[in-house]
Every structure is written in C-alpha cells, then in structure tokens.
Amino acid sequence: ILIGRKEEIDMYEIKEIEKAVCDGKKIICFNKDITFPTEKGEKPGNGAVVKIIEEDLGIVINSLGKPDDYYIKYFLDNNIHLDFVIGDRVDTDIFFGTKLNAKTVLVNSGVSNFEDVNNADIVIESFSKVVPFIF
C-alpha cells in the first residue's frame, strides 16, 4: 500500500487500509507532511492520515520523502553533500537539512510549523529572499 495525498479521505478508507495492513500487506507513504497549503488555507496532509494509522496500529510507516531514514541514507551512502536545504517545513525540510549537516533556510510560506522555527539556521519571508544567502 502506498499512501499519497488525496484531497479528501474518510474514516472508511483509513479502516480499509488498516485492515489490509493487519492482513499482512506492506505499507509506505510518500511523505508525512501534516498539512499542505491551499488558496483557502491549510488542509490536512498525507501525514495526518499516516499518523492516524500509525497510532491505531502501533506501527511506524516508512516514508519515501524527507526526512525519512531511507531518504537520508541515500544521500549519505552516495556521498551527496548539500550546502543548503531550503524549505517551508521545520518537521521535514529543516530536520532533513540538519541530519545532512547542511545549512538550513526556512521560508515562511504560510505553512504552520509545529516545531520551533529557531531550529533553522536562517528564516526568511519569501523564496525570492533566498538568493542573497546562497550566492
């Protein structure tokens, strides 16, 4: 089972996923972003669904995205060095950059950050302000 973002998901779908996992199906997700921004404000993201399933079943679902260990391991195993990681989420982008010993830049995109924004090396108001920091 691969969990990706859907605009709407209901408890029936979550229970069906949980039943399949209990029946032995493997599960992984694209990302664990709790929310995602829309023109009308934030909506529950893929991570909100993943968190429900993890808590209901007492499991940890691996992710293909930042900052999961699979993703970090790929960079480390292939000697890929990043000078900067730029993103709008502390819990994914900034955490990922920190794990790779990169300088981290948090862009205030309007996404609620549930982690301390002081975890980022640099905090800026818009992506256009990033350029002076990296060049």
Report residues per predicted region.
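Asp-based, Mg2+/Mn2+-dependent phosphohydrolase catalytic module
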Residues: 2-135
